[in-house]
């Protein structure tokens, strides 16, 4: 089922889009970016859209499919990284204390988007943090401008391109197992606490 009409209908119902307003790549980016950072019941694009929430994986799986429907080829990227006091100074005290004890390993998703299929030019797109997270000094991307790379929501250690014929979530889970190792449960608790803090601070 095409996702762009579903996005338009859900965004209109929520008062985020004017009736009849056209969904462009920039509009799709804005709507997905501003979904609350919170895990949906699963990461299927339809679920993320229906529940209007997602973390970096669900948001970018949805945004990839939307952009492809709008004519822009897009590829899921996986990046290993760590939350530290130095690269995440915006963390609240209880989470800052956690990363000072030891960095929290994580695996992040973002996109590479072919914004000009004729010229073959690609750009980095990251819709992880809602725009309102800027007031918490988080690195949210405010605009989608063709040809302008967006800031990645982490400091990548290693980057992997997901092949078109591979399940991105299965690949991500393998990389989480390798990167987080025995800290996988700690990582999971950290992401849950981060989502709860953002829900308290930003609403949604």
Name each region found by the language model.
Residues 1-54:
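Secondary-structure boundary elements
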Residues 1-2, 23, 71, 115-120:
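Solvent-exposed, well-ordered amphipathic alpha-helical segments
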Residues 15-20, 37, 81-204:
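His-Asp-centered catalytic microenvironments across diverse enzyme cores
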Residues 25-28, 74, 79, 109, ...:
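Small-side-chain structural scaffolding
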Residues 30-31, 65, 69, 113:
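Residue-level signal for well-ordered alpha-helical scaffold segments within enzymatic catalytic domains
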Residues 42-100:
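Active-site neighborhood of thiol-dependent amide/isopeptide-bond enzymes
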